[in-house]
From Swiss-Prot:
Top-rank taxon: Bacteria
Name this protein carries in UniProt: Orotate phosphoribosyltransferase
Family note: Belongs to the purine/pyrimidine phosphoribosyltransferase family. PyrE subfamily.
EC number: 2.4.2.10
One Pfam family per UniProt: Pribosyltran
Paired cysteines (S-S): none
Function, as annotated: Catalyzes the transfer of a ribosyl phosphate group from 5-phosphoribose 1-diphosphate to orotate, leading to the formation of orotidine monophosphate (OMP).
SUPFAM superfamilies attached to this UniProt entry: PRTase-like
Keywords: Glycosyltransferase, Magnesium, Pyrimidine biosynthesis, Transferase
Annotated orotate binding sites: F34, F35, T128, R156
GO biological process, one term: pyrimidine ribonucleoside biosynthetic process
C-alpha cells in the first residue's frame, strides 16, 4: 500500500470521518465501517484532504485539462485539490463548479470558474448510487467536453442492487476510470496490521464476502 493511502486512513480515523463498528446504511445493510467526508470541515482538514487527492491524482498519471467539482460536496474538494496540486506539484490547473440552480443575472448560467472544456477530471467524496455523477455528465456533455476520469476519497467496492457496484456502472456507462484515494481492500489491509483495529477484520471480511465486487 502506498504511504499516502496509509496516512489518509490514519487522518480519516483521527477526524472520526472513518469509524469501525456497526452502522445501518440507507440501503438497510449493516456495515462494519462508516465514512463521512463532511467531517473534514476545518481549514487544516481541507488542506490535508486536498493533498491526499493530489497525491492520488499524480500517482495515477492522469491526463486532464480542467478540475470539475460538482455541487455541493465537490465544490470545496475541487478547490482544495487545485490548490494542493499547485503547492505540492507545481501544477496550475483550472477549476470549475456548478450551481444547482442557474442564475439569470450577473455572470449568469450554472457554471462558475474556468470554462468547462477539454478533458475533465471530476472530483467528489464518494459514489453511492451514481446519481450525482450522471447529473455532472449531463453538464460536461452540454459543454462539449469529455470526462477523463473521476477521483473520489473512498471506493467501498460494494454491489448495488445488481451485480455491479455504482462505480463499475459509471465506468461501464461512461468508459472512464474511477480512481480513489483508498478502497475497501486498503482498509482491510490497514486494520489487519493495526492491533487497535484488528478486532474488526472478521466483520470486514464477512461484509466483503457478502456484498463485495472484484
Amino acid at each position: 500500500m502506498q504511504n499516502y493511502k496509509q496516512e489518509f486512513i490514519k487522518f480519516a480515523l483521527s477526524r472520526n470521518v472513518l469509524r469501525f463498528g456497526e452502522f445501518t446504511l440507507k440501503s438497510g445493510r449493516v456495515s462494519p465501517y462508516f465514512f463521512n467526508a463532511g467531517l473534514f470541515n476545518t481549514g487544516a482538514d481541507l488542506a490535508r484532504l486536498g493533498e491526499f487527492y493530489a497525491s492520488a491524482i499524480q500517482a495515477s498519471g492522469l491526463n486532464y485539462d480542467v478540475i470539475f467539482g460538482p455541487a455541493y460536496k465537490g465544490i470545496p474538494i475541487g478547490t482544495t485539490v487545485s490548490v494542493a496540486l499547485f503547492n505540492k506539484f507545481n501544477l496550475d490547473k483550472p477549476v470549475c463548479f456548478n450551481r444547482k440552480e442557474a442564475k439569470d443575472h450577473g455572470e449568469g448560467g450554472n457554471l462558475i470558474g474556468s470554462p468547462l472544456q477539454g478533458r475533465i477530471l471530476l472530483v467528489d467524496d464518494v459514489i453511492t448510487a451514481g446519481t450525482a455523477i450522471r447529473e455532472a455528465m449531463d453538464i460536461i456533455a452540454a459543454n462539449n467536453a469529455r470526462l477523463a476520469a473521476v477521483v473520489i476519497a473512498l471506493n467501498r467496492k460494494e454491489r448495488g442492487k445488481g451485480e455491479l457496484s455504482a462505480i463499475q456502472e459509471v465506468e461501464r456507462d461512461y468508459r472512464c476510470d474511477v480512481l480513489s484515494i483508498i478502497d475497501l481492500d486498503d482498509l482491510m489491509q490497514f486494520i489487519e496490521n493495526e492491533p487497535e483495529y484488528s478486532q474488526y477484520l472478521p466483520a470486514m471480511k464477512a461484509y466483503r464476502e457478502q456484498y463485495g465486487v472484484a
